[in-house]
Regions:
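Conserved helicase motor core of SF1/SF2 NTP-dependent helicases
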Residues: 1-196
Length: 196
């Protein structure tokens, strides 16, 4: 597994005789997003931007409390829509996970009904989703998928440790065209420190 995307704290293992391939090329994300990933040191080594699309730097929005979190997340969604990204291609990703997320417990964000995993499965093993127009998911569950526009929200940490780096890396690399990041004041300070 790509070490920068290892979200779960599990012991690694070796497969005897297996060939290991290391590739730091990123074909999905706009070059501007990859530049920020490299500036923050989110991956071991430099990530090579291979997308032909330069794009824009991610927008960063800070919040002080739960009300501010909702307001800034909604503003980030609106920003992506104003840039012409179809609503069906926007996803809100919580960096906190299903158990700790404030937003994943909500039925709506502003006027938008949220489409989210309800934590159960059909008899056939398919996930059960709520009805809604705006997809919201955790970074953990959205790993391996992508969307044109991503709002990475509930980014809350005091130190940019390995866990925070990995969640940021996975969340940021889900974006194909544009990225908005909603951070707590503590995370804002930690990110500013990493760039200093």
């Amino acid at each position: 597994e790509d070490e920068a995307q290892r979200l779960y704290e599990r012991d690694g293992f070796d497969l005897d005789g297996a060939v290991a391939v290391r590739c730091n090329d990123n074909f999905r994300s706009p070059r501007a997003i990859v530049d920020v990933i490299n500036a923050l040191g989110l991956a071991e080594g430099t990530v090579e931007a291979r997308s032909p699309y330069v794009g824009e730097l991610p927008g960063f929005r800070a919040y002080d409390d739960e009300r501010g979190l909702r307001r800034q997340t909604l503003a980030a969604v609106e920003s992506l829509r104003e840039r012409g990204i179809p609503f069906a291609e926007v996803v809100v990703l919580s960096a906190r996970g299903h158990g700790r997320s404030h937003l994943l417990k909500e039925a709506k964000l502003g006027a938008f009904a949220l489409r989210k995993f309800l934590g159960r499965y059909t008899a056939d093993g398919e996930p059960v989703w709520s009805e809604g127009e705006l997809l919201i998911e955790s970074v953990h569950r959205f790993k391996g998928q992508s969307a044109m526009g991503v709002v990475l929200t509930e980014v809350d940490f005091e130190q940019l440790d390995e866990g925070a780096r990995r969640r940021l890396f996975v969340g940021m690399t889900r974006a194909q065209l544009a990225l908005e990041i909603v951070v707590s004041r503590a995370a804002e300070a930690a990110l500013s420190g990493a760039l200093a």
